[in-house]
């Protein structure tokens, strides 16, 4: 497996410096600049994690009383770092359009695998489709301010009035 991964990592070549491409591959090697940025970000990891957790708490607190919004609940025994701030609403696509029209970078959850063109699976997965049609990813960057989060939550409340 390691050898196969190395082939993929090196543009499909078995060895560096050899121009024979054994199979389709990719260039997964980091540039020095990317590595330097990664090292700098690792040093600030605790700050990023703290901000993302606080942002999620603020979103949940501000949206808790909105009947149409179901908050994504994490296992309380786990210590998660929210990659995304997810809510569920009756019609995600309409809310997302409204938020985007008002300057908020909201998006859908990932399209279900069975709906991806490369898989072409014509089966019915109603739970997956329901989650996709109702899930909204709100901004989650550590750089969000309290004002940003309050603005987003006020827009959501206004949308459902």
Regions found by a protein language model. Name each.
Residues 1-161:
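PLP-dependent aminotransferase class I/II
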């Amino acid at each position: 497996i390691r050898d196969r991964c190395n082939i993929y990592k090196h543009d499909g070549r078995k060895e560096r410096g050899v121009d024979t491409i054994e199979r389709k591959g990719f260039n997964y090697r980091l540039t020095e600049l990317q590595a330097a940025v990664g090292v700098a970000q690792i040093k600030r990891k605790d700050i990023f994690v703290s901000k993302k957790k606080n942002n999620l708490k603020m979103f949940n607190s501000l949206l808790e009383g909105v009947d149409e919004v179901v908050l994504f609940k994490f296992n309380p025994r786990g210590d998660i770092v929210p990659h995304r701030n997810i809510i569920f609403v009756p019609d995600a696509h309409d809310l997302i359009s409204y938020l985007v029209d008002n300057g908020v970078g909201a998006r859908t959850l990932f399209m279900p695998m069975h709906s991806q063109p490369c898989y072409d699976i014509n089966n019915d997965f109603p739970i997956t489709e329901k989650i996709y049609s109702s899930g909204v990813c709100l901004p989650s960057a550590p750089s969000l301010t309290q004002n940003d989060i309050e603005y987003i939550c006020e827009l959501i409340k206004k949308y459902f009035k």
